[in-house]
Amino acid sequence: MKEKKNWLGKVVLLIAVIAAVAVYFLVPGVNKMMNKVFAMFASGDFTVVRDFVASYGAYAAVISFLLMIFQSIAAPLPAFLLTFANANLFGWWQGAILSWTSAMAGASVCFYIARILGRDVAEKLTSKSGLAQIDTFFERYGKNTILICRLLPFISFDIVSYAAGLTSMSFMSFFIATGIGQLPATIVYSYVGGMLTGGAKLFVTALIILFALSALIFMLRKIYMDRQSKKEKGRI
């Protein structure tokens, strides 16, 4: 019964992927819109994202929700730009609720894509090296990996979601850890995003980049030292 369910899930997801690719290449309007969305995230300017979302008027919140799910699937597009935009557009706590719920939906989609379609698809949507790094975290911290990674801003939330789907972890354990883990970052980004204007925007963005790079260097050094330690123990 379980195998039949997984097979059905694979068929449904494959049909959805094929349909999405076909629409992208065959419908000019969709192609143009998707290219615009990619360029918007690539700009690194949350005001561009905010203006795009705001242009949909009464449907702005719905568009933001869908964009968050899209950026989750198309890792590693920067989610913090959308979180900043939501806070700046809707108010910091309203934006936080929207960003948190939509990020949870996106994480769930990534989890099930990996769980149903497997590692090859997950690697194509993220990166082989990125998943390998998260695998290292899972080997070391087990189920606590989700909570730890969600609290580290320099680790892609989306890659963690895909990696979790490749493990034996239950969806509910993943969902709860994800919800708790990404709440602090969502609140902080939303609060800051609600105040960002002009020079403050550039200043905070620079601080975030500096912090992320510093933390990344520290973590890579830690992983390198652990591997060297294992090699030395293996020689003894």
Question: Which stretches of residues belong to each language-model region?
Answer:
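Transmembrane helix boundary and interhelical junction motifs in multipass membrane proteins
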Residues: 65-94, 154-160, 172, 179-188
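Hydrophobic alpha-helical transmembrane segments that constitute the membrane-spanning cores
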Residues: 102, 114-115, 184, 189
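Transmembrane helix-bundle signature of multi-pass membrane transporters/permeases
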Residues: 100-104, 151, 175-183
